[in-house]
């Protein structure tokens, strides 16, 4: 990566980024986004508005055709080793047990050490899967598979997680449990998160900042000023309803 000037308080910055999949058809236009260390930043918008494309550009999975993506004060041109990824489908390897699936990002680069095993077990215990170390992914529920995917993404101690609607296919109760556990474990590790969702309640519960997208643009970024740590009981509070209504209005205005 190429060192460039950037504000020290920002871990990730997108500046005036535009992108097209097809020549002459602009998918994203003039995207500006800042993400600070330990920040949970949600991207929300209707299907097809460009949320996933922004996430891929921010992660170096796509290259901006205009503007720049700055990661840790360096111009980003490819995904980095201190980035982690969780997508909607956990994509666990069925022939490996749960523990080996979590250790896979390390095993692809070097031999597994005792400290790696301890860390993998601690992450799985934190995700409520201490009894599943040696089980196979096919024996797990959808929520449990998502927990394994999160542990796998955290095993390399990334500075940021890129998450693309990771809980969209889960039932409401499981989704809320995972949201709560994700916030807790990432707060412990001081991990930043860029999180794509179409769910207003999810964005308000998780996000410190929420950017509203429509038609390939970020139209608004709202600060969600709710107490930390977040608790499930908060979902029924007047403050939560206030920010949910504010976010819904922002989405309706730009639709």
Report each predicted region and the residues it spans.
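Helix-to-loop junction immediately C-terminal to a conserved catalytic motif
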Residues: 59
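The feature captures the beta-strand-to-loop junction immediately N-terminal to the Walker
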Residues: 44-46
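Conserved ABC transporter NBD signature motif
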Residues: 67-79
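Conserved ABC ATPase signature
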Residues: 136-140, 144
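ABC-type ATPase nucleotide-binding domains, specifically the catalytic core motifs of the NBD
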Residues: 22-23, 63, 96, 100-116, ...
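Hydrophobic anchor residue at the start of the ABC signature
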Residues: 150
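A short, proline-enriched helix->beta-strand linker immediately N-terminal to the Walker B motif
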Residues: 155-159
